[in-house]
Swiss-Prot record:
Top-level taxonomy: Eukaryota, Viridiplantae, Streptophyta, Embryophyta, Tracheophyta
Region (Disordered): 245-293
Descriptive protein name: EID1-like F-box protein 1
Biased composition (Basic and acidic residues): 250-259
Provenance organism: Arabidopsis thaliana (Mouse-ear cress)
InterPro entries: EID1-like, F-box-like_dom_sf
């Protein structure tokens, strides 16, 4: 609900809008006509703190509700207000792939710049496959991997992102806290700047994740922040010929052979980059380490 309250600019004495602002209802109608264009919303936010506050409270919320109406309705159901105050971060997550940096969050050897994504589909079913069996009553929406092909030794890299419903009361958060998993020492969420937990370090990445993401086993890593934003990386398996496909437990999916169409040594390098160690490697789900150390 739009409150009929007048605000004064708190940006600076030299701000050009010191003589008052347009009514919020007028701005709402203007941006509704513009279909909640995210670039224009971001531009308006740079004008002054009053516009920035209005964009965070109203415009980004309307953008999210328009871009993913069913998902937003579910995230706010059952009295859940966990995304209140984070609409801008959620809006960015819907349309922006954060990429990865060399030696950054994912300890990757490639540099993939962040970029906007024209169209993204978020799936609750895909999110469920990324959760361990004991946590599958949690609700997680995850997008299909954003494909970045031919990344040298890394192969075909997939970057994905998602959002938990009511993360503060989720079983995943409870498991992470019970296992005393530490926050990442330096990296933060690219969407809300909150601290991050590694779900690989928490040992709660199920085998079903690689099947549903069509990625190599042991080459998947994802993090979740305090606000429930999830971001991850995987090495995508190449499409297999029909005779090479291995049926999985899920009749709707097939598991790809790791030695078909893609050098196995690159798979091992990617796995060792995530898990650290020799070619045989340590058991899966070990904490990320730098193989050069």
């Amino acid at each position: 609900m739009i409150l009929p309250k007048q605000y004064c600019c708190t940006h600076s004495p030299s701000c050009q809008c010191t003589k008052g602002h347009l009514n919020e209802d007028v701005l709402l109608l203007v941006f509704q006509h513009l279909n909640w264009n995210p670039k224009l919303v971001a531009t308006l936010s740079c004008v002054c703190r009053w516009f920035d506050d209005f964009a965070k409270r109203v415009l980004w919320k309307e953008f999210c509700k328009t871009r993913a109406p069913k998902m937003m309705l579910d995230l706010q159901s059952s009295g859940s207000h966990c995304i209140d105050g984070n609409w801008r971060a959620l809006g960015k997550l819907l349309i922006y792939c954060s990429g990865c940096t060399q030696g950054g969050l994912f300890n990757s050897s490639v540099q993939i710049p962040g970029h906007f994504v024209y169209r993204t589909r978020f799936s609750r079913t895909l999110g469920r496959s990324l959760l361990p069996p004991q946590c599958r009553t949690d609700v997680l929406y995850v997008c299909d991997p954003c494909e970045h092909l031919d990344q040298g030794e890394e192969g075909d890299v997939g970057l994905f992102r998602g959002i938990f419903k009511s993360f503060p009361t989720s079983k995943v958060r409870k498991v992470i806290i019970n296992k005393a998993v530490p926050f990442h020492p330096s990296e933060v969420c690219p969407y809300c700047k909150a601290k991050l937990w590694s779900m690989l370090q928490a040992k709660i990445i199920p085998q079903s994740a690689c099947i549903r993401l069509e990625a190599y086993e042991d080459c998947i890593e994802y993090f979740v922040c305090l606000n429930g934003h999830l971001l991850g990386i995987c090495t995508l398996a190449p499409l297999s010929d029909s005779e090479d496909a291995i049926p999985s437990e899920d009749n709707n999916h097939t598991e790809k052979k790791q030695d078909n169409g893609f050098p196995r040594e690159n798979v091992l390098k990617r796995r060792n980059s995530l898990l650290g160690g020799s070619e045989n490697g340590p058991p899966p789900q070990k904490r990320l380490t730098n193989p050069n150390q």
